[in-house]
Design a protein with these regions (language model features):
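Extracytoplasmic
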Residues: 115-135
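Extended, amphipathic, non-transmembrane alpha-helical segments
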Residues: 91-98
Length: 135
């Protein structure tokens, strides 16, 4: 009976030893990533939503992703995936701020759609996939 209790206790305690960030990426980062994407897509598709309020929302939502990433740590054994997520997001954000948003604001919609549907789509998809791997 003591042996059975010891085995049960070991399994129970092992369950408590799950890293504190299990699910953290999907629960906290994914919604911020989605909000950042949605704010930019709204600006791109709706010419009447390119004013200062929407521009601020586009910047704030991207900054929220960066801030959340800065608070997070790689789960044990997944340091490479976390590093790749941070680097991919940084490239995505830089292109967004220095190329994509300026194209949208200049009314160069076709160029913006090409950039948004090309490398930026690849990067955001990679970020989403890495979040899945990190959870």
């Amino acid at each position: 009976m003591k042996k059975l209790l010891a085995v049960f206790l070991a399994f129970f305690l092992a369950g408590l030893a799950v890293p504190a960030n299990a699910g953290e990426f999907g629960d906290t980062l994914r919604p911020k990533l989605s909000a950042a994407r949605e704010s930019l897509v709204t600006m791109m598709l709706h010419k009447d939503q390119r004013g200062s309020d929407q521009q601020k929302l586009v910047k704030d939502t991207a900054d929220a992703v960066s801030a959340q990433l800065a608070k997070m740590k790689a789960p044990a054994g997944k340091e490479a995936q976390f590093k790749e997520l941070v680097e991919t997001w940084a490239a995505f954000k830089k292109t967004r701020e220095t190329e994509l948003v300026p194209l949208i604001l200049k009314g160069k919609d076709e160029e913006a759609k090409k950039l948004g549907g090309g490398i930026q789509k690849e990067r955001i998809t990679k970020c989403q996939n890495l979040i899945n791997e990190l959870d």
